[in-house]
């Protein structure tokens, strides 16, 4: 087998973050490696005992433009890009008096950190690295003879190969190059995400440049750019995915440190994949009810119960009462501070996760000491609207996140089509039910009373079955109580036939809110009129798949 290792005799080092560079310095000194470096990196290496040649001494040209130009010079880039297995490249370097590099170590200006710090536009732009990515890409392209290192986690490996004189094999250099290209791709994607948000197309160009999709439809490039580029940083791997045979990891947005993915865990076992899915769903659900105090109990990405209360404890008791059996092993979310009274209510119930913006000290102590396995999460801010992204085979589907912000979500826009106008209390329940239906998997039917769910039918492939399920849960999960009678109902989409609405009417609901839009709307409305049941049409649908 051919030996493809190339010893490291000459290295170019230019790093913004200096952490861990000591291990490289020690190896360079031990091996007598010739080191070329820039500015503060050169100073740090010299302090560590490395004999360093400044880049400006190689190029014969000083740094200029406030440091914007340091390494952008043929004497540097020819030394990086020369393939020393190519005799012509070697000959040209000799003609120009340029020495090749065997190793390039670079990490980039902290663009994402600068954005997260809230820096102004000018300071943010200064942290867009130019020379660094150029060196990284050049060295990665020329992996035939150059090893490129961008990850400080690889410094120990590099140091050992420098010190023992073996260098890296071709396959190892390819692996390092692949990491480097991933690094610069993520860096550029982060810059692209920031510029797309802050530098939209000006109105002055609307008439001269029209963005169209592959079917000729005009598109708003700010919402759906021609290339969809995003980058997420791996936070940590998870024990497993949705099932034990699936691997999984959590990735976070590098441009902000807020949101559910950045939740602070105050107690309990590590979060699982399913914990994240359910807790995120619960977190979104309770904020649909803001500014009212709300608690949601979620399991398998569906609500077991949701309620509004005068206090967090009251909201939790009402939400739990909807379906106590299903709440076992569920996730609880609260959009206000968890009080000691609420914590005492949660204590006897087996719960996987609780998430809230804050906790009373006594409540937190009780949950931490009496429920040691309970995952306790604190998220400082409500969820933000963002793109909903779903991967399909060979592509992505991207849409706006479904929020309670459509015209039809405003009860003032509802159309009364049957029965008498709802009184104040009934209307409050209808508004609650309509806001709650967004979080229920389609086909979804939800029964509510006193601003709390009392029966939920979700995930059925026909609406009639969802109606039956909602009524059944309302009437069989409450010690024989008939909770459907006098309740209100919400449907996430129209009733295609009158049969589904009739199930609710026969169960005794007094009012129904639904989008309308069926070709048989009149049949559905007539059934409500015949029974004297109030019915409102919203004109807005909330499918959830």
UniProtKB/Swiss-Prot annotation:
Catalysed reaction equations from the record: (6R)-10-formyltetrahydrofolate + 5-amino-1-(5-phospho-beta-D-ribosyl)imidazole-4-carboxamide = 5-formamido-1-(5-phospho-D-ribosyl)imidazole-4-carboxamide + (6S)-5,6,7,8-tetrahydrofolate; IMP + H2O = 5-formamido-1-(5-phospho-D-ribosyl)imidazole-4-carboxamide
GO terms, biological process: 'de novo' IMP biosynthetic process
SUPFAM superfamilies associated with the record: Cytidine deaminase-like, Methylglyoxal synthase-like
GO molecular function: IMP cyclohydrolase activity; phosphoribosylaminoimidazolecarboxamide formyltransferase activity
Keyword Nucleotide-binding recorded: no
Any one GO CC term of the record: cytosol
UniProt keyword Hydrolase, yes or no: yes
Pathway(s) the chain acts in: Purine metabolism; IMP biosynthesis via de novo pathway; 5-formamido-1-(5-phospho-D-ribosyl)imidazole-4-carboxamide from 5-amino-1-(5-phospho-D-ribosyl)imidazole-4-carboxamide (10-formyl THF route): step 1/1; Purine metabolism; IMP biosynthesis via de novo pathway; IMP from 5-formamido-1-(5-phospho-D-ribosyl)imidazole-4-carboxamide: step 1/1
Family the UniProt entry places it in: Belongs to the PurH family.
Domain text: The IMP cyclohydrolase activity resides in the N-terminal region.
Family matches, as PANTHER family: BIFUNCTIONAL PURINE BIOSYNTHESIS PROTEIN ATIC, BIFUNCTIONAL PURINE BIOSYNTHESIS PROTEIN PURH
Name assigned to this protein: Bifunctional purine biosynthesis protein PurH
Organism: Bifidobacterium longum (strain NCC 2705)
């Amino acid at each position: 087998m051919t030996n493809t290792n190339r010893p490291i005799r000459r290295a170019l080092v230019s790093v913004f973050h200096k952490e861990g560079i000591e291990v490289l310095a020690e190896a360079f000194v031990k091996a007598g490696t010739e080191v070329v470096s820039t500015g503060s990196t050169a100073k740090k290496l010299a302090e560590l005992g490395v004999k360093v040649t400044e880049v400006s001494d190689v190029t014969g040209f000083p740094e200029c433009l406030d440091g914007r130009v340091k390494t952008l010079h043929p004497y540097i880039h020819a030394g990086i890009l020369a393939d020393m297995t190519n005799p012509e490249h070697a000959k040209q370097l000799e003609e120009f008096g340029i020495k090749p590099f065997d190793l390039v170590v670079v990490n980039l200006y902290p663009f994402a950190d600068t954005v997260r710090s809230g820096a102004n536009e000018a300071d943010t732009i200064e942290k867009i690295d130019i020379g660094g990515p150029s060196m990284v890409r050049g060295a990665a392209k020329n992996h035939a003879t150059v090893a490129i290192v961008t990850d400080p986690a690889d410094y120990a490996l590099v140091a050992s190969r420098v010190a023992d004189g073996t260098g890296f094999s071709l396959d190892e250099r390819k692996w390092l190059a692949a990491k480097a290209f991933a690094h610069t791709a993520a860096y550029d994607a982060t810059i692209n995400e920031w510029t797309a948000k802050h530098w939209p197309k000006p109105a002055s160009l609307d008439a001269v440049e029209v963005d169209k999709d592959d079917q000729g439809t005009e598109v708003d490039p700010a919402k759906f750019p021609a290339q969809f580029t995003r980058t997420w940083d791996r936070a940590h791997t998870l024990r497993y995915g949705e099932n034990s045979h699936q691997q999984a990891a959590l990735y976070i947005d590098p441009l902000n440190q807020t949101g559910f993915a950045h939740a602070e865990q105050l107690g309990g076992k590590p979060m699982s994949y399913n914990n994240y899915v359910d807790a995120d769903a619960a977190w979104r659900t309770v904020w649909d009810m803001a500014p009212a105090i709300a608690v949601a109990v979620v399991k398998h990405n569906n609500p077991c119960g949701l309620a509004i209360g005068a206090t967090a404890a009251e909201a939790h008791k009402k939400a739990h009462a909807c379906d106590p059996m299903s709440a076992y092993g569920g996730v609880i979310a609260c959009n206000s501070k968890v009080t000691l009274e609420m914590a005492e209510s949660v204590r006897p119930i087996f719960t996987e996760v609780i998430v809230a913006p804050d906790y009373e000290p006594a409540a937190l102590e009780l949950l931490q000491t009496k429920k040691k396995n309970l995952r306790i999460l604190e998220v400082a801010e409500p969820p933000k609207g963002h793109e909903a992204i779903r991967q399909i085979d060979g592509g992505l589907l991207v849409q706006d996140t479904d929020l309670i912000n459509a015209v039809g979500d405003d009860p003032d826009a509802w159309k009364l089509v049957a029965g008498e106008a709802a009184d104040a209390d009934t209307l409050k329940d209808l508004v609650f039910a309509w806001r709650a239906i967004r979080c229920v998997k389609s086909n979804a039917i939800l029964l509510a009373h006193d601003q709390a769910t009392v029966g939920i039918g979700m995930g059925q492939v026909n609406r009639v079955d969802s109606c039956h399920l909602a009524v059944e849960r309302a009437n069989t999960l409450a010690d024989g109580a008939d909770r459907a009678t006098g309740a209100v109902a919400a449907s996430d989409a129209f009733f295609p036939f009158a049969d589904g609405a009739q199930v609710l009417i026969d169960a005794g609901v007094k009012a129904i809110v639904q989008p309308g839009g069926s070709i048989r709307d009149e049949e559905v409305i007539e059934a409500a009129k015949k029974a004297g049941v109030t019915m409102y049409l919203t004109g807005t649908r909330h499918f959830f798949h």
